[in-house]
A protein has these predicted regions:
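Conserved N-terminal beta1-alpha1 strand-loop-helix module at the mouth
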Residues: 1-125, 129-204
C-alpha cells in the first residue's frame, strides 16, 4: 500500500482534522515556502500528531549543527532536507535521525541521488517549480533504479494521484498545495485530503 504524507500543515485545527483521516505522515515546513512556520509553532503542532502517524520536518539547515538543534527542539520522526547540504553534514545528521533527501527532478537527478544513497533513508522527488508536475518518466526510472524508498511530490492532487502512482510506482506520495482551499496557502481542504488518501491507498 502506498505511503501518504500530507505536508505544509500550518495550524492546530488542521493537524487534528488531518490526523483523523489517517495519513501515514504529516509534514511541517520550516524552509522558505508560503506554508513556512516558525520553530516554536512547529513545536506546538508536532505535539498534536498522534504516535500512530509519522511526523516530518522540512528544512534547509546550513550545517549539521543547525539540523541537530532542530531535531533536539522538535523531535520529529524524519528530517526532510531541501538544500544541497554537504554529504559530510548529512552523514552526521543521519546518525541522529532518519533523513528524507529532496531531489529536484531533471536529467541529472539520478546521478545526484546516488551520491546521497548511503546516508539517507528515503528520497523525495520534487519539481523545480513548486506545485507543478514534473517529468514522471524520469521519476519512474529513478524509482525503479533506487535502492531506497522513493516518495513522489510536485503538483499532485486527488485528480492525478492515481495516474502518478501508476506511472511512477513510488513507495509514497506527498501533497501540499494540491489539497488546499484555493487561494489560501497552508489551509487544508479536508474533502480533497480525504479523496487523495482514499485514491492513493486503493491503488494496488
Amino acid at each position: 500500500m502506498v505511503w501518504v504524507k500530507i505536508c505544509g500543515i500550518t495550524n492546530s485545527i488542521d493537524v487534528e482534522a488531518v490526523a483523523k483521516l489517517r495519513p501515514d505522515a504529516i509534514g511541517f515546513i520550516l524552509a522558505d515556502s508560503p506554508r513556512k512556520i516558525t520553530i516554536e509553532k512547529a513545536r506546538g503542532l508536532l505535539r498534536q500528531v498522534p504516535s500512530s502517524i509519522e511526523s516530518v520536518v522540512v528544512a534547509t539547515p546550513a550545517n549539521a549543527r543547525e539540523g541537530e538543534e532542530l531535531i533536539s527542539r522538535l523531535q520529529p520522526d524524519y528530517l526532510q532536507i531541501h538544500n544541497d547540504l554537504a554529504i559530510a553534514e548529512i552523514k552526521k545528521l543521519g546518525e541522529k535521525i532518519a533523513i528524507i533527501k529532496a531531489i529536484q527532478v531533471n536529467s541529472n537527478a539520478f546521478e545526484k541521488l546516488k551520491r546521497y544513497e548511503k546516508y539517507v533513508q528515503a528520497f523525495l522527488l520534487d519539481s523545480v517549480k513548486k506545485g507543478t508536475v514534473h517529468n514522471w518518466d524520469i521519476s519512474a526510472e529513478i524509482a525503479r533504479k533506487s535502492s531506497l524508498p522513493v516518495i513522489l511530490a510536485g503538483g499532485l492532487n486527488p485528480e492525478n494521484v492515481v495516474e502518478a502512482i501508476s506511472r511512477v510506482k513510488p513507495f509514497g506520495v506527498d501533497v501540499a498545495s494540491g489539497v488546499e482551499i484555493e487561494g489560501r496557502a497552508g489551509v487544508k481542504n479536508l474533502d480533497k485530503i480525504r479523496a487523495f488518501i482514499e485514491r492513493a491507498k486503493k491503488y494496488v
